[in-house]
């Protein structure tokens, strides 16, 4: 059992990295990877949000939405899975709002550094994608807990690595036409190629 969860965690972080394998959450990934401090803050926020929303959405899906989930209420044939997207967005929005209030109260500097991108986590496709992958792969509650943490950790690892590279690029002689997003896209592409080396690993 432990080996299964460990392989699921490694797979979520490296083999199926949200940012570098599926290219999810690219908006905030590119916008907030200019400074290491902001990248670390957003990475931690994404880890927290995914670690909470994926298992919560798993419990809601298996307890209320999937076909036959309401058998306990005498409604064995009811299928509410069409409400999945709406429900997941609601859960994500609530968790992000709570996180925003906590950061505003206890970490105002980080809250100001993240700015508008913190509430944008609500519509970050990496956050939504993790919940949709969880449903598609029919994870148990325990698996969804590990997968949510791993997916967030993988995304955080990618943005922190990119931030480190971009800080070094400030002192490099980058051709004028590639400065800014141009060299950043090339860097992300090379990072993705690096992470492709994990794709042949069977876990």
Curated annotation (Swiss-Prot):
Pfam families: Rnf-Nqr. InterPro entries: NqrDE/RnfAE, NqrDE/RnfAE_oxidrdctase, NqrE. It is a multi-pass membrane protein. GO terms for biological process: respiratory electron transport chain; sodium ion transport. It catalyses: a ubiquinone + n Na(+)(in) + NADH + H(+) = a ubiquinol + n Na(+)(out) + NAD(+). It is found in: Cell inner membrane. It comes from the Bacteria. NQR complex catalyzes the reduction of ubiquinone-1 to ubiquinol by two successive reactions, coupled with the transport of Na(+) ions from the cytoplasm to the periplasm. NqrA to NqrE are probably involved in the second step, the conversion of ubisemiquinone to ubiquinol. Belongs to the NqrDE/RnfAE family. This is Na(+)-translocating NADH-quinone reductase subunit E. It comes from Hahella chejuensis (strain KCTC 2396).
């Amino acid at each position: 059992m432990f080996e299964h969860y460990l392989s699921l965690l490694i797979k979520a972080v490296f083999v199926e990295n949200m940012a570098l394998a599926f290219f999810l959450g690219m908006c905030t990934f590119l916008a907030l990877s200019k400074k290491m401090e902001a990248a670390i803050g957003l990475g931690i926020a994404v880890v927290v949000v995914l670690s909470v929303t994926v298992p919560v959405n798993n419990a809601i899906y298996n307890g209320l939405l999937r076909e036959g989930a309401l058998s306990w209420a005498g409604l064995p044939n009811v299928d509410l899975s069409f409400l999945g997207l709406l429900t997941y967005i609601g859960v994500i929005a609530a968790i992000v709002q709570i996180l925003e209030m906590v950061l505003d109260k206890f970490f105002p500097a980080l809250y100001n550094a993240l700015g508008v991108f913190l509430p944008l986590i609500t519509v970050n496709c990496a956050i939504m994608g993790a919940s949709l992958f969880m449903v598609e792969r029919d994870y148990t509650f325990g698996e969804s807990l590990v997968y949510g943490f791993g997916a967030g950790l993988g995304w955080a690892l990618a943005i922190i690595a990119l931030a480190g590279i971009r800080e070094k690029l400030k002192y490099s002689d980058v051709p004028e036409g590639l400065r800014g997003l141009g060299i950043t896209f090339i860097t992300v592409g090379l990072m993705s190629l690096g992470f492709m080396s994990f794709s042949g690993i069977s876990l």
